């Protein structure tokens, strides 16, 4: 079952940008990352597969403009914006945990899948 966990205005993320989104009512303090690449909109849990820490706690450091990649501020692992696969860094080949995301009528909706 897919349950909406957050929503933000579509205008809050331009192409080739990433943003952090609070997930309300979550006891683990998790946040989501939303990325708009040139090809698609993607969302992931803000947790590095290398050591489980948040990739970043300040959205202005989340997107590496030179590489067009999401970047972990701790060990500089970089992740492909459409797939979430780490293509350079200590967790090379590992993937961020994806979240279903949809864009409808000026809003980005982020979901969590539950059994």
Which ranges hold each PLM region?
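N-terminal pre-ligand scaffold of iron-sulfur
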Residues: 1-63, 80-81, 95-115
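Mid-chain, well-packed structural core segment of small domains
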Residues: 56-88
